[in-house]
Amino acid sequence: SPYNSTNQDILISQGLISKIAENIEADKETEVYTFENLYVSCGWFDSGVSFGEPGFEERETLSNGLEVAARSGFTKILLNSNTDPIPDSKSIIGHLIKMSRGLTTTLYPIGALTVESKGNQMASLYDMISGGAIAFGDFKRPIQKANLLKIALQYCQSFEGMVISHPINNELAGKGVMHEGITSTRIGLKGIPSMAESVQIARDLEILKYSGGKLHIPNISTEAGLDLIRKAKKQGLKVS
C-alpha cells in the first residue's frame, strides 16, 4: 500500500472507505473519531475456522462466530469440515453458505474429501465445488491411502480444487500425546516422533510431484516438515 507506515485520515461513507489523506476536513454532519496508535490493514483471512453449527450449537452458532470474526478484522474465513453432519455433499455445503448470507464476513466451506471423512471413498467433489466449496480435506485426519490422494489431486485439476492433507502418519504416531523425546520419557507419556510428520509430508509431496494439482498441508510443527515444503516450492510444486 502507498500508505504503509504513514499517518492518515480515513473517511468512511455508508460503510465504505471513500477517501484516505493526511488531513481530511470534516463538515458539521461528519462524526469524527480520534485514536492513538491505531493500525489499519486490509481485511484478514483465516484458513482454518471451527464453529459449532451445525451439530454443536452449544459451543457456538455460525452467525455468532462470523460476527466475532468480523469484529476481529477477518473479512473471509475457511470453515473446517468438522460439523455434524459432515459436509460431504452439495446440499450441506449450500446450506452452510445460505446460513452465512447477509453477514459481514464471507464464509468459504471446506468440503470433506471422503464420504463421512472415513478415508475410504472419495466424496462428490465436483458437486461440492458447484455448491460453493473451495477446498477438500478430512479435518485433522491424514489421507492414509496414497492412491486416494493421487486420484483426488488429479481429479481436482479439472476445476482448480485444492486438496488438504493433515501431516501425520498414524502408524508412526500411534497413541502418542506429545513430542517424543527426553521430556516424554521422563514424565511417562507416550510420544510422537518428529518423523511421523516428515514421513507423511515427504510421501504427499512425491504424490503431488507425480500427479500435479494443488495441495495444502496445515499445522506444520517440525523443522524437517518446513524444509520439505520449501524445497517443493522451489521445484515449482503448488503446495502451501
PLM regions: where:
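Histidine/acidic residue-rich metal-binding segments in metalloenzymes
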Residues: M122-S240
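Active-site loop-to-helix "anion-binding N-cap" substructures in soluble metabolic enzymes
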Residues: P54, S81-T104, G111-I134, Q144-K145, ...
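Active-site metal-binding motif and surrounding structural segment of the metallo-beta-lactamase
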Residues: I24-V40
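Metal-associated gating/positioning segment near the N- to mid-region
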Residues: E36-S100
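Divalent metal-coordination and catalytic microenvironments
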Residues: G15, N37, G48, A69, ...
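N-terminal metal-binding scaffold of metallo-dependent hydrolase/deaminase domains
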Residues: S1-D27
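Alpha-helix-loop-beta-strand connector modules within alpha/beta enzyme cores
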Residues: S41, K90-I110, Q154-I168
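Active-site mouth loops of central-metabolism enzymes
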Residues: S47-E60, S81, T105-Q121, K140, ...
